Design a protein with these regions (language model features):
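An alpha-helical, amphipathic repeat domain used for nucleic-acid recognition
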Residues: 1-186
């Protein structure tokens, strides 16, 4: 093998992957794990895997550390922004934690984000459960005649959304008038 051509090939590959990473960051604002998976998939698809996985992994790690050093990637900031966005959508804290874990965020950043949410809002799970009931038209948003018939179904929907039994029971026990007053406060 010719070391000079290998060096040129290595530099071309690094430049191509760095360009792909920058364009992806510009478009999507991903976490470190997401950009790593994206670059690996692009390498396998575009360059047909001409190098060993260890070499490619090193190249991708170098690119990611360089991007992180230049403040293009920041998992703490990513975790905070995603957690707030999920909370606005009506996710429970459990579902937020699970979603951030699936995005590849480490436990320390997840804990910090959840603590910030708890400090900013009093009982964020209750507020999110109210939003979920409004969005899915369950619990207090159902007609009074159907509420008892659909009680178990509504409990199941809230449980699958990540809310605890106490919060679900409290929400489903609210009257429609009380619920609407609470919605105005949100």
């Amino acid at each position: 093998m010719d070391p000079i051509s290998n060096k040129k090939e290595f530099e071309d590959l690094t430049v191509n992957l760095r360009d792909l990473a920058c364009s992806y960051i510009e478009k999507y604002n991903p976490s470190k794990q997401q950009i790593k998976i994206y670059l690996l998939k692009k390498y396998l698809k575009k360059f047909q895997g001409s190098k060993a996985k260890k070499e490619i992994s090193k190249i991708i790690d170098n690119i990611i550390s360089n991007l992180e050093k230049n403040c293009f990637l920041n998992d703490a900031l990513y975790s905070d922004s995603k957690a707030r966005m999920f909370l606005r959508r009506g996710y429970s804290l459990r579902k937020i934690i699970y979603s951030l874990k699936s995005k590849g965020i480490d436990q320390k950043n997840i804990k910090l984000s959840i603590e910030k949410i708890k400090n900013e809002k009093s009982d964020p799970d209750f507020v999110s459960a109210v939003k979920t009931c409004k969005k899915k038209r369950i619990g207090p948003k159902r007609p009074e005649s159907n509420r008892e018939l659909f009680y178990k179904k509504d409990m199941g929907i809230l449980a699958r959304s990540g809310f605890g039994y106490d919060i679900s029971k409290k929400i489903l026990a609210m009257s429609n008038k009380e619920f609407n007053q609470f919605l105005k406060l949100i």
